[in-house]
Design a protein with these regions (language model features):
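Conserved SAM/SAH-binding loop
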Residues: 11, 36-37
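Glycine-rich helix-loop-beta junction characteristic of Rossmann-like nucleotide cofactor-binding loops
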Residues: 20-25, 47, 91-92, 114
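Helix-to-beta-strand junctions that scaffold the AdoMet/dcAdoMet cofactor pocket
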Residues: 48-49, 76, 116-120
């Protein structure tokens, strides 16, 4: 996208999986916690299309300004609302999907869960296994279908007589966790 970045990047291999696993498509309503430089915001916007909505929050002023510049520079995104704040507002609305890309995503899971519709999808990305463990603890209440993955992508040298992997690859770029909001089943009163 040509995004000027000041934050850790989400690699295309991870971004593609995030869009796929969150099932973001035309008309989707998406919450993003941690806009960073706005690259994923752009992806979510394009996947959701003109009928969709992306509501993005970035608490850090410097990152917010950079994301805003990137979004402005790369065209009119009428389906994006960028807020310099923690996740606030929108309590009376429901979203199809949410993505959290901050240092401690588990601290936002309860709030984000309250904004997801029943069956809504949540994703996170973190760089360390310890953070994955904390995310899993945060997902224990109110989420199911939990998955954790790491995407490895290896390119090959293009030579029909000696097809083999390239000598270098970007291996670990982050751990992705995905889950689905589940509703509590309240037994009927006798």
């Amino acid at each position: 996208y040509g995004v000027k970045r000041e934050t850790q990047i989400v690699y295309p291999k991870d971004a593609a999986m995030i869009g796929f696993k969150l099932n973001i498509r035309c008309g989707s309503r998406v919450i993003e916690v941690g806009a960073g430089s706005g690259a994923l915001t752009l992806l979510f916007s394009r996947l959701a299309g003109p009928e969709g909505q992306v509501v993005s929050f970035e608490k850090e002023e410097r990152h917010f300004r950079n994301a805003q510049k990137n979004l402005d520079r790369l065209g009119s995104l009428k389906n994006v609302s960028l807020h310099q704040d923690d996740v606030t507002g929108y309590e009376d609305e429901e979203f199809d999907a949410a993505f959290i890309d901050v240092r401690e995503p588990w601290l936002h899971m309860e709030k984000v869960r309250s904004l997801l519709k029943a069956g809504g999808l949540l994703g996170t990305i973190v760089p360390t296994a310890n953070q994955v463990s904390d995310c899993l603890r945060g997902l224990q209440a109110g989420f199911g279908d939990i998955e954790v993955m790491e995407i490895m992508l290896r390119y090959y040298k293009i030579n029909a007589e000696r097809l083999r992997p390239q000598d270098r690859m970007v291996a670990h770029t982050g751990y992705l966790a995905f889950a689905r909001k589940i509703e509590e089943i309240v037994p009927p009163q006798a």
